[in-house]
Amino acid sequence: MADFDEIYEEEEDEERALEEQLLKYSPDPVVVRGSGHVTVFGLSNKFESEFPSSLTGKVAPEEFKASINRVNSCLKKNLPVNVRWLLCGCLCCCCTLGCSMWPVICLSKRTRRSIEKLLEWENNRLYHKLCLHWRLSKRKCETNNMMEYVILIEFLPKTPIFRPD
């Protein structure tokens, strides 16, 4: 009778082990790198629109290309303004003791946030239903020691249907 009001943690351990097992078997994320000629603070002016072979059977190539084109159009709209401010900031940097770089930093952050919002909208609209998650991530470049922003497409683990909430 002493075990009547005792709390057992076995179920929580089983659930945690199941989640770890699902994460262990999910494939590596797909990395979509920038392919533009201009890079401002690690953000390229466009991303590769070539369909990765690891997404075959998960998403239609047309949907992938449409999503990348939306991101590229957002970059095309925002990045020329950032480049102009960067050039102006570099010219005036010595006179203003670096304060002329603040507009570029703020515009770059605004561009990143608009891309993150766009990717979140794409996730909610389509990709979460397909067990995919798109996000903007900072990664080290393959060719040099600098950092760049890439689009990571992660595979979400499917939740088992046979387990109740």
From Swiss-Prot:
The keyword DNA-binding does not apply. It holds the Pfam family Erf4. It is found in: Cell membrane; Cytoplasmic vesicle. Residues 1-26 form a coiled coil. InterPro entries: CHIC1/2, Golgin_A_7/ERF4. Keywords: Cell membrane, Chromosomal rearrangement, Coiled coil, Cytoplasmic vesicle, Lipoprotein, Membrane, Palmitate. It is linked to A chromosomal aberration involving CHIC2 is found in a form of acute myeloid leukemia (AML). Translocation t(4;12)(q12;p13) with ETV6. Belongs to the CHIC family. This is Cysteine-rich hydrophobic domain-containing protein 2. The lineage of its organism: Eukaryota, Metazoa, Chordata, Craniata, Vertebrata.
